[in-house]
Curated annotation (Swiss-Prot):
Highest classification ranks of the organism: Bacteria, Pseudomonadati, Pseudomonadota, Gammaproteobacteria, Enterobacterales
Species: Escherichia coli (strain 55989 / EAEC)
Record's subunit section: Heterodimer of ArnE and ArnF.
Cytoplasmic side: 1-2, 57-76, 122-128
Ranges per topology, Periplasmic: 24-35, 98-100
Record-annotated membrane-spanning stretches: 3-23, 36-56, 77-97, 101-121
Pathway(s) it belongs to: Bacterial outer membrane biogenesis; lipopolysaccharide biosynthesis
HAMAP family: Flippase_ArnF (MF_00538)
Membrane topology: Multi-pass membrane protein
Keyword set, alphabetical order: Cell inner membrane, Cell membrane, Lipid A biosynthesis, Lipid biosynthesis, Lipid metabolism, Lipopolysaccharide biosynthesis, Membrane, Transmembrane, Transmembrane helix, Transport
InterPro entries in alphabetical order: Flippase_ArnF, Small_drug/metabolite_transptr
Keyword Transmembrane included in the entry's annotation: yes
Record-given protein name: Probable 4-amino-4-deoxy-L-arabinose-phosphoundecaprenol flippase subunit ArnF
Source taxon at top rank: Bacteria
GO molecular function: carbohydrate derivative transmembrane transporter activity
Length: 128
């Protein structure tokens, strides 16, 4: 059950991160504070996506809380690294994100996935 809550947390946090990235790239920069505040108060699509991203992080924290009650901390924190993989893949697949593929990033993803496999795959008992 803890693994399920952890996966929910990772997926929700990844979607929230993508939402916040979208909002940050479409809202006026905070260096133009009055324009930024006006865009928030107009509550257009960009501001709504910003709010959804923030609410997504809040929901992700609730799922993370449930995860920590059911799953060992060493496994739970390792699970968070999947968010990097999901966001990287989504940025390349989703239209308008312009995520770039590189061998360096692919090597990083391979390291993350290898580490997760080492942590989560069942260990065989050795007889001496």
């Amino acid at each position: 059950m803890g693994l399920m809550w952890g996966l929910f947390s990772v997926i929700i946090a990844s979607v929230a991160q993508l939402s916040l990235g979208f909002a940050a790239s479409h809202l006026p920069p905070m260096t133009h504070l009055w324009d930024f505040i006006a865009a928030l108060l107009a509550f257009g699509l960009d501001a709504r996506i910003l709010l959804l991203g923030l609410l997504g992080y809040l929901l992700s924290v609730f799922c993370w809380y449930k995860t920590l009650h059911k799953l060992a901390l060493s496994k739970a924190y390792a699970l968070l690294s999947m968010s990097y993989v999901l966001v990287w893949i989504a940025s390349m697949v989703l239209p308008g994100w312009e995520g770039t593929f590189s061998l360096k990033a692919l090597l990083g993803v391979a390291c993350i996935m290898s580490g997760l496999m080492l942590i989560f795959l069942p260990m065989t008992k050795q007889r001496y």
